[in-house]
Amino acid sequence: MLRLTLHIIAACWIATSCTGDNNLRRLDTTSSTHVYMDSMPELKSRSDLINKSTLHKEHVHEVIFVVQQQNMDELTAILHDVSDPESPNYGQHMSGEQITSMTMNPIAREAVVNYLHASGAIVTAESLDNEFITAKAPIRVWEKVLNTEFFTFQQEQIDGDIEEHIRAEEYSIPLELYEHVDCVLNTIEMPIRLTTKPVSYEVALPAPKKGRFAAQTTYRGYVTPPVIRSYYNLSDNHGSDSSTQAIFGGRFDYLVSNDLAKFQSLDDIEIDQPAIDINGHIVTDISEVPAGSDCGEGNLDTQYIIGVSHGSPTTYWSWQVSLAGWLIAVADTIDPPLVLSISYGGNEKFISPAEFRVFSRMAIKLGVRGVTIVVASGDDGAVNFEARGNLGKCGYFPVFPASNPYVLSVGATSVSL
C-alpha cells in the first residue's frame, strides 16, 4: 500500500505553544492562591449552545489533569528529522517506551496526585506515560480547586436532539500546581459542532453490477477504488499485515458491515471487514443504526480506505466527545494503528487553546512513533460550513483538526468522469 510518512503539511498560529509552554498564564485577579489558566468567551457566540443552567454542588464530575511534559522541543525536532526524506534519520522512529522515558515528568505527576487526594478527589485513571490523570469529585470540590463555577450547557445537535455538558467558562489552578499542570480538560472545551450535511444533488445513474468496478478503470458517474488507484498511480490495492489503519468514527456515526460487503462485491474483491470495533459502532444492517444517528462518514471512510489498502488490519474507532480525547486514547495504546483517518472537523475558533495544544502534543508523539494522521480539510473551503446559505458569515475560518500543523491535511481532487 502507499505508506504515508509526511507528518507536517500545514501551519497555524495559536496563542500558546503547541509543545506545552503556556504563555498566557497570569495571576487570577479574583484570588491570591490561583493562577489563571484558560477561558472560552467564544462559547457565548455558539448558536448550538441553547441554554445554560446551574447544577447541584454534589453532582460528581470527572476532569483530566494534563501534566507538564519534558523535552517536547527536542521531541518536535526529532519528528521533523525522521519525517524528512532527505534526512539520514528518515523513518527511524522511536518506541512509545522511549518517548515516555524522554518526556515523562514524575515530580509533576506526584505533585498533582498528592494535591488531588488532599482535596478530596478520587483518581480514577492514569495514562501509560502518566501525562493524563483522570479524577472525579463533586462539583463543589472542583469549583474550589479550579476557582470557578460549573454550569450545565445544552447543545443542540443537527437532528434536533439535545446533549448536556458540564462545563465552566474559565478556570484557574492553585499556585502550588503552576509548574506541574499544563491544563485541565473537561472544564471549558465543548464537543465540536458537527457540520451540516453536504450540499448534494440527485443524479440518475445506473447501478453498477457485481464486479463492474474491477472490470474497467472508470464507471461514468462513480468515483470507484479503481479510479482512485489509476488517478494516483497506485499499482494495486493490496496492503499488508504490518500496514495497520484506523478510522475515526464520530459519536453519531455507524459502520454497516452489509453495506461494506456490497461495496466490496462491486470491486470484485474478497470481503474484508474491520478487525477491531472500539466502542461498538459497527452494526450488521442499517436497521440497527439508532435513531438520530447515521452511517455516512463511517461507511464512506471504511469502504475507501479498505478499497485502496485491502488486507491491512483495520480498526473502526468511535469516540463520543473531543478529537483530542480520541487522540489521547490512541496514543495510550502500546501498538497504535500506523495510519489514522479523520473526516470530521469544526470551526477552530471554538477549540480551546488547551485542547489544540494537547492534540498537537499527541500528534507529535504519535508522529515520532511512525503514525500518520490524515485529516479531511472540509467541504467548504476557507469560509467553513457556517457560510452555507449565509454570506454574512463569509471569512477565513480554519477547520480543526485539519489546521493542526502535525497532521496531513487532505483536500478534494476534481475528477472528470
Per-region residue spans from a language model:
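Substrate-binding/charge-relay-adjacent region of secreted/lumenal peptidase catalytic domains
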Residues: 23-128, 134, 139-412
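A shared catalytic/ligand-binding motif for oxyanion handling
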Residues: 414-416
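Cleavable N-terminal signal peptides of Sec/SRP-targeted secreted and luminal proteins
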Residues: 3-17
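Boundary of Sec targeting at the N-terminus
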Residues: 19-21
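Acidic/proline-rich low-complexity IDRs
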Residues: 1-5, 23-26
